């Protein structure tokens, strides 16, 4: 029989006592009263905070939005089909946050920043709150650098600056997404990080956009956040905030970012669905009372940071869909009042074959020429005035039978200027190409051409200019000014190419 020494026993007991941990873990637990339509009513959870994440037994996560006297209303970030009445719910003590890192570039993620492109996990060491406060007044400065879209109509007449919020608004099928995606394609080589947020769109449309980005090499500097039409309303509501958090990560690291919300009408509809199911009182068009705050707290996160914070920027291009051109509906007026200008796309222009279908008359940028290089200011000043006069004359000319020569000339010039603004999709132009194109139009060099020839002439002319007169692009790029030397080179190129073009057309 083994001798047991009492000292050994006592030392083992002492060791066990030392290792004993008296930690008490307290959980805030509740019980599901009712679940359905993406909403759960929970009894208990007495100390839960508004916006806190709650975890259900099956692993589904929800957000506590309604804190009522006898229950908590939570929205689910999933279908919630396996949650049962009477099951327990745990408060996590956290609010929604996402991992962030440079590795997100080139990836497609959902509203919880989880990859959905089948390319594996995304490494990330930092995280950011989905709902971060916007920069304050002292943290900002006014926008002064141009954010080129590559579209002549916008860059010349409705210029966008880095840190600006410019609304893209129009009916369905007027080319809103095309304007937004072309802007992303034009950021190639500009050192701008782009975030494209697709909210409630068809999965096929999102796939098409991602395909375009991949073909044109734009995915290298772009993150796509997608919640398609079959996603729960909660995730469609969160997607824009996730996109903003990813863009902010780069903005606070002294980089320039561009974020596109496509589109905020669908986010508002998802939020309306959640609010009505939570039994919040409906307001105008059945939207809840805080739908303005929904968009204002999102769009206020776009900013041009002060020099103390590194001068990073976040430019936001929110998209809003109108019904039959009604800009005075609830969501359009809300977003117009929050943003620094709007680019209005009209169905009439689109149907008339003017693409991009931008209605220059009612589109505006509140940053204005501060967001243009000097060369663009020099040539584009005349363009908006001439187009406005043309629109007025055109309306008048429909009723007048005999017009004097000056009026006929002005109408002819206006029609050619309108042709000059037409562009193919996914073919953004550099600023020097735009300057050359506008100069050709406003100085009457295209007046000798037939209207049908103008677009072809300009496409060939831009190629001719790049190939034969590289000095012109050098001057504009280096000095940002349309100098006398640049004008001489451009005039030469126009005359040479016009001669060639007319000879070709005669054959």
From Swiss-Prot:
The UniProt keywords, alphabetically, are: ATP synthesis, ATP-binding, CF(1), Chloroplast, Hydrogen ion transport, Ion transport, Membrane, Nucleotide-binding, Plastid, Thylakoid, Translocase, Transport
Ligand binding (ATP) = 170-177
Q: What is its EC number?
A: 7.1.2.2
- The superkingdom listed in its UniProt entry is Eukaryota
What GO MF annotations does this protein's record show? ADP binding; ATP binding; proton-transporting ATP synthase activity, rotational mechanism
Indicate the annotated site residue(s) for Required for activity: 363
Q: PROSITE patterns recorded for this chain?
A: ATPASE_ALPHA_BETA
Stated membrane topology is: Peripheral membrane protein
Function (record text):
Produces ATP from ADP in the presence of a proton gradient across the membrane. The alpha chain is a regulatory subunit.
Per the similarity annotation, which family is this? Belongs to the ATPase alpha/beta chains family.
Which named protein is this?
ATP synthase subunit alpha, chloroplastic
The taxonomy runs: Eukaryota, Viridiplantae, Streptophyta, Embryophyta, Tracheophyta
By which gene is this protein encoded?
atpA
């Amino acid at each position: 029989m083994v001798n047991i020494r009492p000292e050994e026993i006592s030392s083992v007991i002492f060791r066990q006592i030392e290792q004993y941990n008296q930690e008490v873990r307290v959980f805030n637990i509740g019980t599901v009263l009712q679940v359905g339509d993406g909403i759960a009513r929970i009894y208990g959870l007495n100390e839960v905070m508004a916006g806190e994440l709650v975890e259900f037994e099956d692993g589904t996560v929800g957000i506590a939005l309604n804190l009522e006297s006898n229950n908590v209303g939570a929205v689910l970030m999933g279908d919630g089909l396996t949650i049962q009445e009477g099951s327990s719910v745990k408060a996590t003590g956290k609010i929604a946050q996402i991992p962030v890192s440079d590795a997100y570039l080139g990836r497609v993620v959902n509203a919880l920043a989880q990859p959905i492109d089948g390319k594996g996990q995304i490494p990330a060491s930092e995280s950011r709150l989905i709902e971060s406060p916007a920069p304050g007044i002292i943290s900002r400065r006014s926008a002064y650098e141009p954010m080129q879209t590559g579209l002549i109509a916008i860059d010349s007449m409705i210029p966008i600056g880095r840190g600006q919020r410019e609304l893209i608004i129009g009916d369905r099928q007027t080319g809103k997404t095309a304007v937004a995606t072309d802007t992303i394609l034009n950021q190639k080589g500009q050192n701008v990080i782009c975030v494209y947020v697709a909210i409630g769109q068809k999965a096929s449309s999102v796939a098409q956009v991602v395909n375009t980005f991949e073909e044109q090499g734009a995915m290298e500097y772009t993150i796509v956040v997608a919640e398609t039409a079959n996603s729960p309303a909660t995730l469609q509501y969160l997607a824009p905030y996730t996109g903003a958090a990813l863009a902010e990560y780069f903005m606070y690291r002294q980089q320039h970012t561009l974020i596109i919300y496509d589109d905020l009408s669908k986010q508002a509809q998802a939020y309306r669905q959640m609010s009505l199911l939570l039994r919040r009182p409906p307001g105008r068009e059945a939207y809840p009372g805080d739908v303005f705050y929904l968009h204002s707290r999102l769009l206020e996160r776009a900013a041009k940071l002060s020099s103390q914070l590194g001068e990073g920027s976040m430019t936001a291009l929110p998209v809003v869909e109108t019904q039959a051109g009604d800009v005075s509906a609830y969501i359009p007026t809300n977003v117009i009042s929050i943003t620094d200008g709007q680019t209005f796309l009209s169905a009439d222009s689109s149907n008339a074959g003017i693409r991009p279908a931008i209605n220059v008359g009612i589109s505006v940028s509140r940053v204005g020429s501060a967001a243009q290089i000097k060369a663009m200011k020099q040539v584009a000043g005349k363009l908006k005035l001439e187009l406005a006069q043309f629109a007025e004359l055109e309306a008048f000319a429909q009723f007048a039978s005999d017009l004097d020569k000056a009026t006929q000339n002005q109408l002819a010039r206006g029609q050619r200027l309108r042709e000059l603004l037409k562009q193919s999709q996914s073919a953004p132009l550099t600023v020097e190409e735009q300057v050359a194109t506008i100069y050709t139009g406003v100085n009457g060099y295209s007046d000798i051409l037939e209207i049908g020839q103008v677009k072809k002439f300009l496409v060939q002319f831009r190629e001719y200019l790049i190939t034969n007169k590289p000095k012109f692009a050098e001057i504009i790029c280096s000095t940002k000014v349309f100098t006398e030397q640049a004008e001489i080179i451009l005039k030469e190129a126009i005359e040479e190419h016009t001669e060639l073009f007319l000879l070709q057309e005669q054959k």
